[in-house]
């Protein structure tokens, strides 16, 4: 999410898409709806996103973003719209009904969910005092993902670098078998959901790590901890 800073201005899309044409002409880009892609800072930015990406989407209200799914090989990807809620409301029933149906009918070996606002993050939107949306998403989605065996959740918004342990029902870490190959430690088919915050793709690194439950995380750092090429 947050494909561009100001989605209502075509100049931002040209800068992002045209300057990176060599990449985008060869590598598919499957975006989720971020707050900068819709009415925040952008007028009705959701319509601008539709003009620049061509996705097959289910029938839905798209005033504040969009949701969809696709399969690639043995992986089912489910792309959620977290602009569909506020600090005072849950994800709407229309999207939740679609989401549970997608999870029920999944036959692929792996299931990956992608969303903009995080459930678990050491940043201000996941662990700070104003993290009401993260707490709502956790209450609404965490057990659902564990129940249906979601393997990985990719999160944005906080610009941090973090990885949780595999989490089961009740947001509790589950036992995992680990194996080291060529000096790299792997979790072997863990029976829980791993939540990853993979940092910003641009230059907005964030440094402040907020108080969080260390028992849930394998790694939790500010994105300034990484060296960007």
Show which residues each predicted segment covers:
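Active-site neighborhood of phospho(di)ester-bond hydrolases with catalytic His/Asp-centered motifs
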Residues: 1-2, 6, 28-35, 80-81, ...
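Short acidic, glycine-rich surface-loop motifs adjacent to enzyme active sites
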Residues: 1-4, 106-127
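Extended active-site neighborhood of metal-dependent phosphoesterases/phosphodiesterases
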Residues: 11-107, 111, 126-136, 140, ...
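Short, active-site-adjacent cap segments at secondary-structure transitions
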Residues: 39, 120-121, 161-162
């Amino acid at each position: 999410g947050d494909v561009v800073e100001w989605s209502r201005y075509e100049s931002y899309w040209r800068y992002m898409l045209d300057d990176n044409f060599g990449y985008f002409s060869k590598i598919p880009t499957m975006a989720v709806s971020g707050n900068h892609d819709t009415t925040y800072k952008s007028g009705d930015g959701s319509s601008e996103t539709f003009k620049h990406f061509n996705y097959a989407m289910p029938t839905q209200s798209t005033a504040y973003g969009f949701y969809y799914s696709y399969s690639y090989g043995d992986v089912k990807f489910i792309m959620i719209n977290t602009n569909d809620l506020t600090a005072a409301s849950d994800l709407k029933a229309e999207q939740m009904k679609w989401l549970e149906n997608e999870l029920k009918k999944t036959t692929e070996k792996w299931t990956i969910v992608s969303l903009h606002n995080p459930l678990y993050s050491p940043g201000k939107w996941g662990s700070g005092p104003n993290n009401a949306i993260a707490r709502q998403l956790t209450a609404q989605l965490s057990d659902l993902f564990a129940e249906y065996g979601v393997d990985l959740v990719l999160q944005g918004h906080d610009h941090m670098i973090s990885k949780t342990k595999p989490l089961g029902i009740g947001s509790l870490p589950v036992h995992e078998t680990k194996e080291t190959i060529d000096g790299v430690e792997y979790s072997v088919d863990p029976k829980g959901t791993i939540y990853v915050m993979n940092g910003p793709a641009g230059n907005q690194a964030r440094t402040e790590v907020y108080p969080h439950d260390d028992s849930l995380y394998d790694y939790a750092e500010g994105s300034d901890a990484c060296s960007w090429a």
